[in-house]
């Protein structure tokens, strides 16, 4: 009898329209960022070992540039780093308003391709070469160096990366 009564109550609650179920809109930004980090940390670590870019930097840039995977470029083009087409880009692209209207951004088959291309983008450009003289654990130097080399136009870019790295303990991936 108790089981039957419990079942009736459960059914009546589940049919109420006011009963909320977990959805993306109910997840806090902090939880979304943690989910993003959990999902992409393996790619960041793999690329760190191969290309020598601290995983903490890669993850912080991914979180910031992609809006933790929820930004337009991340959703429509799997572009998690805001990388523009630049001269010589022969891959797919998408048009998007950024610093200027209707700019060309790289488009990828999946986010992991974006993670790899981010590493290649930094390795292959002379303006970032000084970063590779820094120690892997010098995330502050990397953050400031990316800003100084012109990766982003936001004057607070380095501070935002540093804040994300410290708030979410991203240096744990730099080991």
Language model regions located:
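Sec-dependent N-terminal signal peptides
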Residues: 4-13
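Catalytic cores of secreted/periplasmic lytic hydrolases that degrade extracellular macromolecules
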Residues: 16-175
């Amino acid at each position: 009898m108790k089981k039957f009564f419990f079942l009736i109550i459960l059914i009546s609650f589940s049919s109420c329209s006011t009963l909320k179920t977990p959805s993306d809109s109910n997840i806090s930004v902090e939880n979304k960022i943690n989910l993003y980090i959990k999902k992409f940390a393996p790619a960041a670590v793999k690329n760190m070992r191969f290309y020598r870019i601290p995983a903490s930097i890669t993850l912080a840039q991914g979180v910031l540039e992609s809006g933790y995977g929820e930004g337009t470029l991340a959703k429509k083009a799997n572009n998690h780093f805001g990388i523009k087409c630049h001269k010589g880009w022969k891959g797919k692209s998408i048009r998007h308003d950024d610093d200027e209207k209707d700019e060309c951004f790289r488009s990828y088959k999946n986010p992991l391709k974006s993670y790899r291309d981010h590493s290649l983008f930094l390795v292959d450009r002379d303006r970032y070469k000084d970063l590779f003289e820094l120690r892997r654990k010098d995330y502050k130097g990397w953050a400031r160096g990316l800003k100084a080399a012109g990766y982003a136009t936001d004057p607070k870019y380095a501070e935002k990366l540093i804040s994300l790295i410290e708030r979410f303990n991203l240096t744990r991936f730099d080991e």
